[in-house]
Amino acid sequence: MAKSKFERTKPHVNIGTIGHVDHGKTSLTAAITKYFGEFKAYDQIDAAPEERARGITISTAHVEYETEKRHYAHVDCPGHADYVKNMITGAAQMDGAILVVSAADGPMPQTREHILLARQVGVPAIVVFLNKVDQVDDAELLELVELEVRELLSKYDFPGDDIPIVKGSALAALEDKDKSIGEDAVRLLMSEVDNYIPTPERPVDQPFLMPIEDVFSISGRGTVVTGRVERGVIKVGEEVEIIGIRPTSKTTVTGVEMFRKLLDQGQAGDNIGALLRGIDREGIERGQVLAKPASVTPHTRFKAEAYILTKDEGGRHTPFFTNYRPQFYFRTTDVTGIVTLPEGTEMVMPGDNVAMDVSLIVPIAMEEKLRFAIREGGRTVGAGIVSKIIE
């Protein structure tokens, strides 16, 4: 029987499986599709296609499914390096994550690293699936593993005591064995995900922001800036701030056009031209943003989590040290910045992910979770995300 088309009336949420290698992320992903979507077998998911995001090649598998409440897009990555790259580049946005931990092994190094990354890149909520419980006979041992997972989550500032932990076996679900730890556990997991992972605010409901890509002057009409509206709505007659690179200034949008047609407003996702009152061609440049007044501020210093490309990925061939000065590509432009490595980190090798402090030579409209590429002479050598603003 043909599957009915996905109902787009439901709220849409992006999630993904995270956790240590071989703890069962891909098996769980397959099991979820079995009950909530169009079934995808383990090897269909495991053979993930390569994609490029911010100049970086990443293997990611995408599946979709739906519960009674929501429609989900779910990402699963075959290798650990793909997770690191995925989370840092935001290639696959995650509104929440399912952390898969093998009950037989407990938390392992990548369990910890994925939780830390989730914290750094701002994944809002995590639900835990304690997998392979059929391999543990001792109830006390299971309790101990659960406690360990909760402590680890709390250590990285997730509410470890409140996070739902569902115990089950992805394999049992796939093989239609022991229903209580198979199908029932997967159904319980998705009901926890439905209830615990918040529905993200839609981009149109957020405050207006548009990165400026190009500036034109139109004789007799004034200056037009073009770009794709990142979030929010802009209506003709509204006041906006021009932020970044230079001192912040204010102007009024006197016209919005799209495909040469005049509109009364532009909204998230639209490629528009905005006519600005009283701004000359020299008063504004690519790399600045138009934004709702007081919604975003310019900054030069921040902490970042970054992934540095390997030589094979087209990155650097050599390590870098404190005082490294590459370009940081934010939204539409490159800005030079100076890197300070954390204490105890001598150097960063190609292929590493690293927490670092960055000081830009000019301010950029910035907030936490903003992504950037690290470039040298136009060539991407890394990717990062703002984890904390310093000044």
UniProtKB/Swiss-Prot annotation:
GO terms for molecular function: GTP binding; GTPase activity; guanosine tetraphosphate binding; translation elongation factor activity. Residues 19-26 are annotated as: G1. The keyword Transit peptide does not apply. Residues 10-201 form the tr-type G domain. Residues 55-59 are annotated as: G2. Residues 76-79 are annotated as: G3. This is Elongation factor Tu. It comes from Bartonella henselae (strain ATCC 49882 / DSM 28221 / CCUG 30454 / Houston 1).
